[in-house]
């Protein structure tokens, strides 16, 4: 084990000398997909609870598709399937985008977490106390101001425990990136196993690194919950 760590620690953590690899790529996949998916989910969640069915139905359909199909299949569709379409081949921008395994992986992860996060946020919006909404209306708040100042801040706090679980699940989901030849942590562990024929050591090291990242994320979310949900836990 010591020999493997000494030889491959840079590849496992951040680079193989030619490109970013290992933990660095895993964190990039996680952060980029969670940030983009989360921002998009806030907008979609507002539409998800809309009384207008022409707004609500397309968003429901989007979340149904991406929550109802395996992420692995979604990644294969983007990485292996999209590039076979004539419209993609004939468009320089799309052609360049879908030829990149990293781009396809980020896209699949972003849309997948967006679908789950949309439902989490929509449920939290429905859970905002009705009294807060009535008070905002009594003060003459517009719908936009009411969402910005009252509903969304309360909903995001309510959603925090469920959202923390989604982020941890997304960390685990980044392990599928090797399918698109992205040199994430699991891909480097597989390469180490191929070079050394020591699967227990190679994948064991990867498991420890995933556990460490999970521990840091859980600690950060627990601290956030203690800060922003203190009024809930004290009741």
From Swiss-Prot:
Q: Which residues form the ABC transmembrane type-1 domain?
A: 23-221
Q: What is this protein called?
A: Histidine/lysine/arginine/ornithine transport system permease protein HisM
Q: From the record, give the transmembrane residue ranges.
A: 27-47, 59-79, 105-125, 158-178, 200-220
Does Cell inner membrane count among this protein's keywords? yes
Task: Supply one GO molecular-function term.
Answer: transmembrane transporter activity
The record's annotation in NCBIfam families points to: HEQRo_perm_3TM (TIGR01726), PRK15069.1 (NF011651)
Entry-linked PROSITE patterns:
ABC_TM1
- Membrane topology listed for this record: Multi-pass membrane protein
- Topological domain ranges for the Periplasmic compartment: 1-26, 80-104, 179-199
Whichever gene encodes this chain, its name is hisM
Identify the residue ranges that face the Cytoplasmic compartment according to the record.
Answer: 48-58, 126-157, 221-235
Q: State whether it acts alone or in a complex, and with which partners, per the record.
A: The HisPMQJ complex is composed of two ATP-binding proteins (HisP), two transmembrane proteins (HisM and HisQ) and a solute-binding protein (HisJ). The HisPMQ-ArgT complex is composed of two ATP-binding proteins (HisP), two transmembrane proteins (HisM and HisQ) and a solute-binding protein (ArgT).
What superkingdom does the record give?
Bacteria
PANTHER family hit by this protein: ABC TRANSPORTER PERMEASE, HISTIDINE TRANSPORT SYSTEM PERMEASE PROTEIN HISM
Database matches in InterPro entries: AA_ABC_Transporter_Permease, AA_ABC_transptr_permease_3TM, MetI-like, MetI-like_sf
A cellular component annotation (GO) from this entry: plasma membrane
Q: Which UniProt keywords apply?
A: Amino-acid transport, Cell inner membrane, Cell membrane, Membrane, Transmembrane, Transmembrane helix, Transport
Instruction: Name the source organism.
Output: Salmonella typhimurium (strain LT2 / SGSC1412 / ATCC 700720)
Which family, according to UniProt?
Answer: Belongs to the binding-protein-dependent transport system permease family. HisMQ subfamily.
- SUPFAM superfamilies of this UniProt entry? MetI-like (SSF161098)
Role played: Part of the ABC transporter complex HisPMQJ involved in histidine transport. Is also part of the ABC transporter complex HisPMQ-ArgT involved in lysine/arginine/ornithine transport. Probably responsible for the translocation of the substrate across the membrane. Required to relay the ATPase-inducing signal from the solute-binding protein to HisP.
